[in-house]
C-alpha cells in the first residue's frame, strides 16, 4: 500500500471493525476528477468461509465510512469512495494476510527487481514476519522476497479446483458492480465484483 493508503487504513480500521468487518487494505488513486479511495473489506477471518461479504454489506460500510470521512477529512479535494469485497483473486496487503494464505499461489509485482525480475508468481511456502520476508516457491526454487519491496500482490485462484474454469479462452472478464453515479464530490459508492460473491 502507498503511504496514503496506510494512513487511511489506520484511521478507518477501527470504524470498520465496529461494523463487524475487517478492513484488509486500501487503494488511493489520483484521477483527473480528483481521487478514488477503494476499500477492501471482509468478514472476520474466524468466521470464514461460512460468512461472506454481500453487496448490502459494502453499501452499509460505504455509508458509515463516508459520514466518518466527512468529519475526519483525511483527504483534501474531491474523491469517490468505493467499498468492495476482496474476491477470489484478492489483493494481499500485509504479511499477516500472506501467512493466512500459506500454500496458495500468488502473483507479485515488485517496486525494484529481485531475483532478476519485477514480476514473480509462485506458491507461498513461508512468511518470516520478524525479518519482513515472504518466501515463494517459483519453478521449484525458494525465493525470499522483501515485503517492503512488494508493490502489489494478488492470489491466483485454482479455477479448475473451484469448478469455475472458463470453457473458452479469450473470454472477457465480466463483473457486476453496485456503484452509485460518480460525481466530483465526496460521494460514496459500494461495489462488488462477481468473483467476490462466489467463494
UniProtKB/Swiss-Prot annotation:
The keyword DNA repair does not apply. Residues 167-199 are annotated as: Disordered. The keyword Cytoplasm applies. Keywords: Cytoplasm, Ribosome biogenesis. Pfam families: DUF150_C (PF17384), RimP_N (PF02576). Residues 177-189 have a biased composition (Polar residues). It comes from the Bacteria. InterPro entries: Ribosome_maturation_RimP, RimP_C, RimP_C_sf, RimP_N, RimP_N_sf. One of its GO terms (biological process) is ribosomal small subunit assembly. GO terms for cellular component: cytosol. It is found in: Cytoplasm. Required for maturation of 30S ribosomal subunits. PANTHER family: RIBOSOME MATURATION FACTOR RIMP (PTHR33867:SF1). Belongs to the RimP family. HAMAP family: RimP. NCBIfam families: PRK00092.2-3. This is Ribosome maturation factor RimP. It comes from Xylella fastidiosa (strain 9a5c).
Amino acid at each position: 500500500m502507498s503511504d496514503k493508503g496506510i494512513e487511511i487504513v489506520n484511521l478507518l480500521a477501527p470504524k470498520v471493525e465496529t461494523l463487524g468487518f475487517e478492513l484488509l487494505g486500501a487503494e488511493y488513486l489520483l484521477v483527473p476528477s480528483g481521487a478514488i479511495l477503494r476499500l477492501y473489506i471482509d468478514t472476520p477471518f474466524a468466521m470464514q468461509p461460512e460468512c461472506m461479504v454481500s453487496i448490502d454489506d459494502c453499501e452499509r460500510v460505504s455509508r458509515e465510512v463516508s459520514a466518518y470521512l466527512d468529519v475526519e477529512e483525511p483527504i483534501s479535494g474531491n474523491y469517490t469512495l468505493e467499498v468492495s469485497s476482496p474476491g477470489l483473486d484478492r489483493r494481499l496487503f500485509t504479511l499477516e494476510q500472506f501467512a493466512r494464505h500459506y500454500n496458495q499461489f500468488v502473483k507479485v509485482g515488485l517496486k525494484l527487481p529481485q531475483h532478476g525480475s519485477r514480476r514473480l508468481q509462485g506458491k507461498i511456502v513461508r512468511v518470516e514476519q520478524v525479518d519482513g520476508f515472504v518466501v515463494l516457491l517459483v519453478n521449484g526454487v525458494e525465493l525470499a522476497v522483501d515485503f517492503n519491496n512488494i508493490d502489489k500482490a494478488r492470489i491466483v485462484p485454482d479455477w479448475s479446483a473451484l469448478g469455475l474454469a472458463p470453457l473458452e479462452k479469450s473470454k472477457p472478464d465480466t463483473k457486476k458492480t453496485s456503484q452509485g453515479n460518480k460525481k466530483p464530490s465526496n460521494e460514496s459508492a459500494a461495489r462488488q465484483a462477481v468473483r467476490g460473491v462466489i467463494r
